[in-house]
Amino acid sequence: MNNNDLFQASRRRFLAQLGGLTVAGMLGTSLLTPRRATAAQAATEAVISKEGILTGSHWGAIRATVKDGRFVAAKPFELDKYPSKMIAGLPDHVHNAARIRYPMVRVDWLRKRHLSDTSQRGDNRFVRVSWDEALDMFYEELERVQKTHGPSALLTASGWQSTGMFHNASGMLAKAIALHGNSVGTGGDYSTGAAQVILPRVVGSMEVYEQQTSWPLVLQNSKTIVLWGSDLLKNQQANWWCPDHDVYEYYEQLKAKVAAGEIEVISIDPVVTSTHEYLGREHVKHIAVNPQTDVPLQLALAHTLYSENLYDKNFLANYCVGFEQFLPYLLGEKDGQPKDAAWAEKLTGIDAETIRGLARQMAANRTQIIAGWCVQRMQHGEQWAWMIVVLAAMLGQIGLPGGGFGFGWHYNGAGTPGRKGVILSGFSGSTSIPPVHDNSDYKGYSSTIPIARFIDAILEPGKVINWNGKSVKLPPLKMCIFAGTNPFHRHQQINRIIEGWRKLETVIAIDNQWTSTCRFADIVLPATTQFERNDLDQYGNHSNRGIIAMKQVVPPQFEARNDFDIFRELCRRFNREEAFTEGLDEMGWLKRIWQEGVQQGKGRGVHLPAFNDFWNNKEYVEFDHPQMFVRHQAFREDPDLEPLGTPSGLIEIYSKTIADMNYDDCQGHPMWFEKIERSHGGPGSQKYPLHLQSVHPDFRLHSQLCESETLRQQYTVAGKEPVFISPKDASARGIRHGDVVRVFNVRGQVLAGAVVSDRYAPGVARIHEGAWYDPDKGGEPGALCKYGNPNVLTIDIGTSQLAQATSAHTTLVEIEKYNGTVEQVTAFNGPVEMVAQCEYVPASQVKS
């Protein structure tokens, strides 16, 4: 009997014994850490040592050092002048206690399959199985769900995954599942959900992910730069493709111009951001607006521009429609309340004369409005994005270098001049091959739903909601498959997620780290990291600086497999392997992608070397000829020949399309709507007075790299995720810097480490999103999160009936010093493995 047979026999014996064991008897005291490496792995580690291996990541390109088979150091790529501090944590991404090592199945699901006790999800008890077993169960569940329920019961989702044009989990998941059968699709995302729906209605394009005016033109022409909820310095560390970080050179130039008095920067934000601090507090005008009152401030600015005759009538007449319909609301002719500076002062906390002075300054010279994404991640977030456009239109500088508005300046190196080059293709999730189960009968349910409402679908199947002019009937989801994403990080109100999770029959997670999504899954499949495979990636995003080889740094760890191989093997089980792979392996795909780039380059006058020469010798190609660009310039120069993608072809200050939807929470023009909860005297603030921000983190990308102990040592407080709080709020609560505190509201509670900082206005607190969920009571709703995931506290409601996006920043909390027993954080340890599965059992001990 070989080791695998012993393994299977041991598992069968173990399952037979499950019924007679107590919990104490079943669980081992150790966490899932390897007792010894396999012989093959040990041999590999003994011989492999190498320096200077080139590869890429979301945090930048690196030269990796391998010693004794382990990835031990990451040095910045020599062309990256401004490397992110986060690359120090990349070796931990491969080697850490939270690494998924083997295929695992939740104990009770292994016993009862889809009839399991779903309340046990999250208790972290898993059984190790073989790859064949795991994939068989994966396939069998797909078959069962398609035959029993049909496509309306299955949802798949991906997210930020890893870099690489070929190894993208989202495309591979989509293609594999599409070859088997239809499923429920999703629209929107968690980053820009409100803005990406409203802006196409207003200016004809999504705006949020597009290139911005070139920084050299901004630095040359702008006199005033308004940072509205945008932290450039912090957020440009990580990009979708491998970043070159060239944009930081322009931040240095901006800092010099600000110090010299050539450009004035205004930061509209409740906190002193990293960008604000970098440019110098003494140089930046800070408008510390009360959270969630940005729209009243915008309306007051617009009112001042109009009442003081500072607005551009010609631009409104020739490039916009609907100002006349908006004006009665602005002036108070509809409701008797002019939206002037005196009115806004009571809501925003900004005195009326400061508001008027800001409007005058913006109108006096060339003004570039740089809008972030955090403000639209709140209830009625569409209104703020719409008003950004209205303000820019009233200023009349849209389409001029250094003027107008932009929503993507903090992302993907925006504003770095783009180079004439090639954009590689990748592994597509689409296929022309019909699925095995070609069933398009969704039984009256919608086939696509807004992603931020998928928990609603689980909890309230059949509920009808509005979404961007359509009626959506939420499908009765029974099975979810996640690859390259972590919904327990990105979705709001975790205790509500847990309630929904209990209604699902099967959850499958494919990842390389034991995130909370994996802990709450039934089948967990170990994927490789980008450092364990070969790939290609763009170097630079909007800059399109070049193409980089992503060389394998170390072999796949433990039993991890590439997503490509996982889904290839899954497809083999229903006779679609060839359709999935298209007859190519990893290197075959890289050569195809490269050759497609060669052909693309010929049409652009760009030469790429032969693949083998690139891969074996060059490893990097750099493109030339950076091109200057002005956002919306073509539209400004000729709106007839270059119309916007709106019904009128113009900027729609009033949208008849939206008005005709008859939504009470998003009407035909931008408006101020009170929030369901709001700090500084707003609804709910008497009981929970602090506004909680959950913005992008400084030391990770969402939840990626939270597993890095190297990085956590730089930012955690008392072993917890930090909560930032003002000195005034801390003093009032008897909280000192370094204290463990409890942050809580009606939705949940977390522990965090207090950081008392004067960068935060009174009434404002912050916990960065992406902190791993670590409940003290397994999968029980209402458990105390021992580490500090802010989505325990956030609210799961749509922004409005238009976008149905996340409202994460509509969140109030209270904070108190924690005097209870501080339990050890266990989020980063992996699951508790059943004793019988820790090692193979000798044949003499196996009973038939």
UniProtKB/Swiss-Prot annotation:
GO terms for biological process: anaerobic respiration. It is found in: Periplasm. Binds 1 molybdenum-bis(molybdopterin guanine dinucleotide) (Mo-bis-MGD) cofactor per subunit. It holds the Pfam family Molydop_binding. SUPFAM superfamilies: ADC-like, Formate dehydrogenase/DMSO reductase, domains 1-3. It comes from the Bacteria. Keywords: Metal-binding, Molybdenum, Oxidoreductase, Periplasm, Signal. Belongs to the prokaryotic molybdopterin-containing oxidoreductase family. Predicted to be exported by the Tat system. The position of the signal peptide cleavage has not been experimentally proven. This is Trimethylamine-N-oxide reductase 1. Its main location: periplasm. Mo-bis(molybdopterin guanine dinucleotide) binds at S191. GO terms for cellular component: outer membrane-bounded periplasmic space. Its cofactor is Mo-bis(molybdopterin guanine dinucleotide). The keyword Oxidoreductase applies. It catalyses: trimethylamine + 2 Fe(III)-[cytochrome c] + H2O = trimethylamine N-oxide + 2 Fe(II)-[cytochrome c] + 3 H(+). GO terms for molecular function: electron transfer activity; molybdenum ion binding; molybdopterin cofactor binding; trimethylamine-N-oxide reductase (cytochrome c) activity. It comes from Escherichia coli O6:H1 (strain CFT073 / ATCC 700928 / UPEC). Reduces trimethylamine-N-oxide (TMAO) into trimethylamine; an anaerobic reaction coupled to energy-yielding reactions. Residues 1-39 form the signal peptide. Its EC number is 1.7.2.3. Coiled coil: none annotated. Transmembrane segments: none annotated. PANTHER family: TRIMETHYLAMINE-N-OXIDE REDUCTASE (PTHR43742), TRIMETHYLAMINE-N-OXIDE REDUCTASE 1 (PTHR43742:SF4).
